[in-house]
Design a protein with these regions (language model features):
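Membrane-proximal intracellular helices of multi-pass ion channels
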Residues: 1-185
Length: 185
């Protein structure tokens, strides 16, 4: 849509790439993750994901204060539904897409998403899954954590796509259908 907000996403991507190059390439001595460590990793991941997820709002100028952008991002990732924005439709389209996408990611849990795309082996992924998924579901769905995450997200993709199709048949344009599907799936 030829918006300047794309620059904010490129800046955040560059920041994250630099952080990865400095810290992410060092492998720990032990790859074993225990239950307590799983809870710490989940907590830190939520904090960091939210902290960096707020940056596009601030860098683009859509939300001028970082604390407000952080609130908006945490609200999305936790699917709280609260907002500090008086006029959501006034956001640039790229930022509006990001805001809705945070709700979609939050719908299944950030950590389940991260587990699906990372290379954790199943033995080390299960403590993270137990820390992220409420109730006994983590142990009962499938013993392989990565497989479970892929299965859940497969169903989530299908539900999201179905909602987009129904909204398109209802007369909504593709962009708005995606935003509504991300925010309600």
């Amino acid at each position: 849509y030829h918006e300047k907000s794309v620059i904010s996403f490129l800046i955040v991507a560059a920041i994250l790439l630099v952080i990865y190059m400095v810290f992410g390439r060092k492998l720990p001595a032990s790859k074993q993750i225990y239950g307590k460590e799983g809870f710490v990793i989940v907590g830190l991941a939520w904090i960091l994901w939210s902290a960096f997820g707020a940056l596009p709002f601030v860098i683009s100028g859509s939300i001028p204060y970082y604390i407000d952008a952080l609130f908006e991002t945490i609200s999305g990732f936790t699917t709280t539904g609260s907002t500090i924005l008086a006029d959501i439709e006034a956001l640039p389209m790229g930022i509006s897409f990001w805001r809705s996408f945070t709700h979609w990611i939050g719908g299944m849990g950030v950590l389940v998403f991260v587990m699906m795309i990372t290379s954790l082996d199943d033995e080390n992924a299960m403590p993270l899954m137990r820390a992220e998924v409420p109730g006994p579901e983590a142990d009962k769905l499938v013993p392989k954590a990565r497989h479970t995450a892929r299965l859940l997200y497969g169903m989530y993709f299908v539900l999201t796509a179905a909602e987009v199709v129904f909204l398109l048949f209802g007369g909504m344009n593709l962009y708005d259908a995606l935003l509504h599907a991300f925010s309600t799936t």
